[in-house]
UniProtKB/Swiss-Prot annotation:
A GO molecular-function descriptor: protein-lysine N-methyltransferase activity
Family according to the record: Belongs to the methyltransferase superfamily. PrmA family.
The organism's taxonomic lineage, starting at the top: Bacteria, Pseudomonadati, Pseudomonadota, Gammaproteobacteria, Aeromonadales
Keyword line: Cytoplasm, Methyltransferase, S-adenosyl-L-methionine, Transferase
Organism: Tolumonas auensis (strain DSM 9187 / NBRC 110442 / TA 4)
Annotated Gene Ontology cellular component terms: cytosol
Highest taxon of the lineage: Bacteria
Biological processes per GO annotation: methylation
Protein name: Ribosomal protein L11 methyltransferase
A Pfam family per the record: PrmA
Enzyme class of the recorded protein, top EC level: transferase
Classification via PANTHER family: ELECTRON TRANSFER FLAVOPROTEIN BETA SUBUNIT LYSINE METHYLTRANSFERASE (PTHR43648:SF1)
């Protein structure tokens, strides 16, 4: 079934109001996008961060007449309110989405493959993944940086903590690369469920332990810890994350912009001999060895 998109430009302050109006006028769904080209990286605690110039996009059935809807917004926000009306052709959107994800190689041994595709190299270390509801498909630079780091390590017989496990991509990759035991921790129950599903898909569910933070093992230290989250939590939880690493163990953190790296290098240098940042696009990974 074809659809109509009605796009109304708003500000960060008026975007929620515009969204509610679109829903009240019969929109089946409303999404936000940047009306300019302004990146938003990290909201404050409890804040839903929006762009200064935000475009609200209402999705309507094709038989809906857009003229009265546009007139409604012109009445409320002025005749010059920016808007756009588009007819969306009928497509198999699930198939379109699935076509977007292709197998990807990280380092020398590791491939991340959507579960609905054939693996390019059956002799490689292949992780089959469904993105599900949790972040982490390998397409984001921070995930790629962590996967490359894991591929570079000798993980045979090692224990590892994936702090903020998301889809489970890093935890599962570590197990497929030879880790003996991996603990995944996440604040989101949906992430725990996605990690569990992906672990079963890859035949490593017996080796992967998944916990919400309040349930994680006490006084446990791993040979290796990886945390691909955001700069704010990495800073605030630095003591907790560092405490998960054994003396002389390894740690990698990502989800960090290049501009945020110097501060976090200083923070983690309390506990680790840190290496220079590894950069990809505008993001970076920091890694180091725990001081004895």
């Amino acid at each position: 079934m074809p659809w109509i998109q009605i796009k109304i430009n708003a500000t960060a302050k008026t975007a929620n109001k515009v969204s509610n109006m679109l829903m009240g006028l019969g929109a089946q769904a409303v999404t936000y996008m940047d009306a300019q080209d302004t990146p938003v990286y990290e909201p404050l605690p409890g804040e839903t961060k929006l762009w200064g110039d935000t475009r609200c996009i209402g999705l309507f059935d094709a038989e809906v007449d857009p003229a009265p809807i546009v007139a409604f917004f012109q009445q409320h926000f002025g005749e010059d309110v920016p808007y756009q009306v588009e007819l969306l052709e009928d497509k198999d959107w699930v198939r379109e989405w699935m076509e977007h994800f292709q197998p990807m190689q990280f380092g020398e041994r590791l491939w991340i493959c959507p579960s609905w595709r054939d693996v390019p190299d059956p002799t490689a270390v292949n992780v089959l993944l469904d993105p599900g509801l949790a972040f982490g498909t390998g397409t984001h630079p921070t995930t790629a940086l962590c996967l490359q780091w894991l591929d570079s390590l000798d993980l045979k017989g090692k224990t590892l903590v994936d702090f903020g496990c998301g889809s489970g991509i890093l935890a599962i990759a570590a197990l497929k690369l030879g880790a003996e035991r991996v603990i995944g921790i996440d604040i989101d129950p949906q992430a725990i469920e996605a990690s569990r599903d992906n672990a079963q898909r890859n035949g490593v569910s017996d080796q992967l332990e998944l916990y919400l933070p309040e349930d994680q093992p006490k006084n446990f230290q791993a040979d290796i810890v990886v945390a691909n989250i955001l700069a704010g939590p990495l800073r605030e939880l630095s003591g907790l994350i560092s405490g998960l690493v054994k003396p002389h163990g390894l740690m990698a953190i990502s989800g960090i912009l290049e501009s945020q790296a110097p501060e976090l290098l200083e923070v983690y240098s309390q506990w680790f001999a840190m290496n220079p940042a590894t950069e990809r696009e505008e993001w970076c990974r920091l890694d180091g060895i725990k001081k004895g």
